[in-house]
Amino acid sequence: IYSNVEAIAESQYVFIQGNALKERIQKIEKTDEKRFVIGECGFGFGLNFLLACECFIRFASPGSTLYYIAGELHPVLKRDLQRFIRLLPDTILSLANELLDTYPENGKTLHRITFNVSKCTIQLDLLYGDAASTFSSICQQKYQVDAWIMDGFSPDKNETMWNKKLCDSVAALSKPGTTFATYTSAGLVRRNLEEVGFHVTKSSGYGKKRHMLTGNFRQTPTISKKSTWSFPWDSTSQASAEKHRKICIIGAGITGCATAHALARRGFAVDLIEKDAEIASGTSGNPRSLVHLNPAQQLNSTMRFRFNAYLYALRQYNSLSKIANFNWQPDGIIQPACSEKEQDAITTLWQRQLYAEAHVSSVNAKRISDLAGYISNYSGFYFPGAGSLDPVALCQAWARHKNIRLFTSHEVLDFQRKDNQWCVKIRGNEEEITAQYDSLILCNNMDVSSFSSLPDYPLAYNHGQTDTYEIPENFKIPTKPLCNKGYLIPWMTAKKRMLTIGGCYAQGIHKLNSSKQLTQRNISLLEKLSPTLHKNITGAQLESISRIGTRLTTKDYQPLIGPVEDTLACKHLYSDLQRNARKTVQANPVYSPGLYINVGHGSNGLTTAPLAGEYLASIINDETLPLAQDEIVVVHPLRYLIRRLKKQEA
């Protein structure tokens, strides 16, 4: 770690002054959006970020937002960041400690971290991976960077960072007037930046460095954002409208409450409509649920979305639990193997080194026993930051915001677009009313198919059940949750030890009248996880409190999150795919204005809903998105129409 005093002085001179951040931030209050976007190549220890935040907090008008996007190929370890922060001055120490608390260990995905300071909001998007590739992955979004901090080693030590691909991505994320600053004055850097449309000026460098480069972007016809698009149909750039201040969300379960909270934090007025008498009355109302990750053999787009969502959920729950009580217990979760075959698969997966040990670690049978007081015959995975919580209390915490109005025992009968607003017919208190909203978000998983105006999404229903036992004092139970095919969660009320088990399900939309069969299936799953505990519970004939619920999922088991397409218009736009499935059609989709959907999370709602809500709020608020482009493809509602067109089924 280098000298902090010199590093701070150099950063202030080269990047803060080089981009004239103080003067430009002071002018934000004269704009309608009150936002400023900074991009950085090379996050390092976060010093440039902290100094930019300090400048923003000092000089931005109240209510302003700083969006900071940074790429980093080699993230520093958390312990090294901790050592670095100890040496920082008091002026940035508070924010630095908050960064340390939320700092994600290496994981090649996009990590969104939000800092709430006294008068403004700071939003950090950390993109782990090669800067050229990671910035390219977000070029299709509505990023328009105001200032670039081009840090990193000099080109002779890190030539790959300064290549033409990176400069193309930087240009695609810039707009006329975007500035940059870098301490290097190398000819390679200057030529590449000039070639993509920047006017470059050589200035006096800091200290012993004779020169540095600054400049501004002058958009030219040779720079086209479309040149970087791999999936043009998934663009969300047309999804946000000019006016989105009053929003209706249908469904007050986990996804609805998470989405409402994300929007309310941004100042939107949200009406949260729930047809049942209580919030989180469906499967969101289980007494106890897990927040966990299912590791896969490869980090493809689907798994990167899941991993991104998992880490984001942990950060949000850790932060929210400081001001709200939903019995969040991030004590870790163990996934033990239940056979030699499973143990071999876990060993093979671990050898791929896809996950940092801070997120997932391989543990042998003895270590499992030490961690959870549970005798295992096999090794397994340990998820240090995962845990369990009370879903109902969580939904209540999300909905308890001054910008959210909750209406229970109110049912949405229909909605239609009229005079640039959504007219929503609502029945409640023995009367029907029609309310007008700028935007409408469907989070009512079980009833979403009742709206005939929606596209024909391939939805599927699964019935599941949890069984909760009061555990006698003489019973020994694991001290941490266990999960495999099924799961068990030890937890406490004020005076009682409880154990919730689950994992069984039955497919179909039919109603289940009896839970006895599912209770036996849960007991069978428990036998695989903990034979001793299974024997004790069945031997003592403990009675369980059973709770049946129905979850909504989709044909490809990925949620539907995003703007709802205009089916007829999109069929016409992408009709060429019926003749050539591999053709790239350069056309933005047409959406139903202000209509969004967020359903189909299945049993992963607690893990994926926070990021899903953040993603929708970012679209509606016309800001940087917390998903990379290939992750958006995974959850975009339009994906099904595109697939049908390619298969000539539409």
Predicted segment positions?
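The AdoMet/dcAdoMet-binding core of the Class I SAM-like
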Residues: 28-144, 164
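Helix-loop-beta segment of a Rossmann-like dinucleotide-binding subdomain
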Residues: 92, 297-300, 324-335, 362-401, ...
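N-terminal Rossmann-like FAD-binding beta1-loop-alpha1 element of flavoenzymes
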Residues: 244-272
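Glycine-rich FAD pyrophosphate-binding loop
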Residues: 265-285
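Dinucleotide-binding Rossmann-like beta1-alpha1 core, especially the glycine-rich loop
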Residues: 288-371
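Helical element adjacent to the flavin cofactor pocket in flavoenzyme catalytic cores
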Residues: 381-429, 433-435, 439, 443-444, ...
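Flavin-dependent oxidoreductases
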Residues: 429-524, 530-546
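C-terminal catalytic lobe of FAD-dependent flavoproteins
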Residues: 537-650
